[in-house]
Amino acid sequence: MKESNLYFIYVGNAYPHKNLKRLIEAMVSLNKKVKENIELYLVSSRNVFTKRLEKLIMKLEAEDYIKLLGFVPDEKLKFLYKRSLAFVFPSISEGFGLPGLEAMNSQTLVACSDIPVFKEIYKDVPIYFNPFDVNSISDSMKLILDIDPEAREKRIEKGLELAKTYSWSKMARETLEVYRSAI
């Protein structure tokens, strides 16, 4: 795989609630609006859902710039996060949202759905969009392309600080304290 200089990344499974169909449609829309060749890397294990996405990508004639990467080892994934324009998380429902924190911890800008769980966890760090509106998703990606470098860095720094508040060791200590207080 040859990495593009300009790409967005999604990491996670391809279940329907992840809303990757609209993300793909938004990417097609974005590429019609900009002069640069912008790519989208979808990092997701292969299954029946990724097969459906492959068919959609081919139908939309987007296979030149939307890539289904399958499984990617952690070291390669860190590299892909770091070099990406942003991690895009278009889910219509989530229980928590760990992938966004992983992206922030990798010093990657995040654009995500404006669903309540993301707003609660991610605060004002990401660029939010309406996950039911392809134009809203596409517009948020365009905003990322046009963002001032200083504003971009501030968001990335803020994301890294937020991600640090969700460390596994901190969560374990807090859980242990809850158990101790219950005894």
Regions found by a protein language model. Give the residues of each.
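Carbohydrate transferase catalytic cores enriched for Leloir-type hexosyltransferases
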Residues: M1-I183
